[in-house]
């Protein structure tokens, strides 16, 4: 497994498992356990996914079964907009996420959107970070101009900005801004987010055939080679492909391929 070192020194796996749209509690527990058992160490959830408790239960089960330790894992959650009203609502949201997970702390906590009083919400996150409740703090869906203004003002700079990133939406300006402020890009919808059909894309199929990989692996590796962390959401019926996705972090495609995508 490859890791990225964040601007505060914390190491983050480059390929992760996202639980967006895994609503059923028992199903979520099971797929999280299966993902960890298969080798995933980054688990990505959010308050708005309403499954922080199930993620925590799956994690604790994996620890109980000796698959991993808590320190082996990197658990991410996010604060939703309704909790960004002010400092106090944000502080309660942070504590609620930690309590629901039952894990004692979170490795990464993000502002899910640049909405509401997100500066006050960030101050609450800074304080929780200093208290050790959050090992790293970041943002999500911050456009380049918003991220620039944000980084110039806050005391603790975000370590990550999770944004939509895939070959159909490359976000070059966003990546340039993140690099300037030493913010690691993290992709949501690395496979196109349902608006595109990369698995029927002849160019991508050709690249996959060339390297004897799946189209999904090519897309994930494309992001990884651009310095992007990928917490891919995996449908339950494709859980058996996890091992192949983990292998993405160790497979290198020639740079001649990348400009083609």
Describe the residue ranges of each PLM region:
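Generic structural signal for well-ordered alpha-helices
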Residues: 32, 52, 56-59, 91-95, ...
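Conserved small/polar residues in nucleotide/adenosyl-binding loops
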Residues: 254-260
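N-terminal binding-site loop/beta-alpha segment at the start of enzyme catalytic domains
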Residues: 1-73, 191
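Hydrophobic faces of well-ordered beta-strands that scaffold small-molecule active sites
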Residues: 13-15, 75-77, 109-111, 139, ...
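Active-site-proximal loop/turn and secondary-structure-junction residues that shape catalytic pockets
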Residues: 21, 47-49, 79-81, 115, ...
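Glycine/proline-rich, positively charged
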Residues: 23, 82-159, 163-166, 170, ...
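Glycine-rich, positively charged active-site loop/lid region within alpha/beta enzyme cores that binds
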Residues: 15, 171-242
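Conserved, mostly hydrophobic/aromatic
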Residues: 17, 43, 55, 75, ...
């Amino acid at each position: 497994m490859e890791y990225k070192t964040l601007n505060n020194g914390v190491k983050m796996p480059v390929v992760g498992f996202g639980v967006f749209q895994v609503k059923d509690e028992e199903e979520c527990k099971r797929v999280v356990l299966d993902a960890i058992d298969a080798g995933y160490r980054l688990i990505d959830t959010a308050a708005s996914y309403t499954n922080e408790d199930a993620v925590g239960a799956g994690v604790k089960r994996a620890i109980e079964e000796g698959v991993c330790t808590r320190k082996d894992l990197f658990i991410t959650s996010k604060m939703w907009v309704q909790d960004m009203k002010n400092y106090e609502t944000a502080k309660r949201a942070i504590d609620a996420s930690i309590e629901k997970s039952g894990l004692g702390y979170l490795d990464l906590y993000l502002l899910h959107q640049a909405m509401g009083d997100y500066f006050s919400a960030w101050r609450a996150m800074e304080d929780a970070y200093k208290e050790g409740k959050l090992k790293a703090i970041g943002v999500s869906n911050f456009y380049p101009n918003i991220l620039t203004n944000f980084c110039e003002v806050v005391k603790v700079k975000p370590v990550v900005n999770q944004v939509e990133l895939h070959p159909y939406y490359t976000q070059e300006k966003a990546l340039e801004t993140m690099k300037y402020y030493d913010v690691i890009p993290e992709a949501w919808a690395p496979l196109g987010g349902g608006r595109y059909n990369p698995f029927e894309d002849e160019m991508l199929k050709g690249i996959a055939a060339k390297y004897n990989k799946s189209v999904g692996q090519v897309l994930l590796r494309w992001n990884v080679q651009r310095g992007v962390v990928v917490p891919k959401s995996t449908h339950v019926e494709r859980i058996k492909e996890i091992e192949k996705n983990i292998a993405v972090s160790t497979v290198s495609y020639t740079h001649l391929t990348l400009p083609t995508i």
